[in-house]
Amino acid sequence: MIKKSLFILAGFSFPFYAGATSFASNVTGGTVTSNLSMTVKASCSATVGDVAFGDQAAGNIKKGSVADKIMSLAIACDTTMANYTLTFTAADGVKDLANGIINTKLNSTVGYQLKWGDSTVKPVDTAITVNGTAITPTNKPTAASFTIPIKVKPVALGEVVSPGAANTALNIKLTFN
């Protein structure tokens, strides 16, 4: 049996800015120009839970028969944000960028595959890019609070799956713009 759990660490960045607005009015004798600068400060919180698979048979991981689990990134703001980006980095490195597979800390034979759980960000079941590049979602938020589901699954990184812990961390940077 392989004992593993996926621990997720999330780093969030929330800069919010609205650009300056300028207007000009023609009046007798000259032009009056006024400038209005505005900074919008919205409050947001984001949470993500740990994902634990418990003990799994090495053969099941090798066959790919361990079921996906959903890791939910829950975002709650006091207003609907216009747009956002997500950036993912893996604490223990990336094994297969094209398929969204990250390494684990102490077990080089097991990794985790990350896929989108629905079409909130990108098409469902497409691999998540874990390389520090900002991902702009396909769909903009339509509510102040929303959830982004991410499918997580342990996968074999070769022909042999060794018993032991298979822990890792995923860093998520969420930027609203």
Model-derived regions: residue spans:
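Sec-dependent N-terminal signal peptides
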Residues: 5-13
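N-terminal signal peptide c-region/cleavage motif recognized by signal peptidases
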Residues: 13-19
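Mature extracellular/passenger domains of Gram-negative fimbrial/pilin and adhesin proteins
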Residues: 19-177
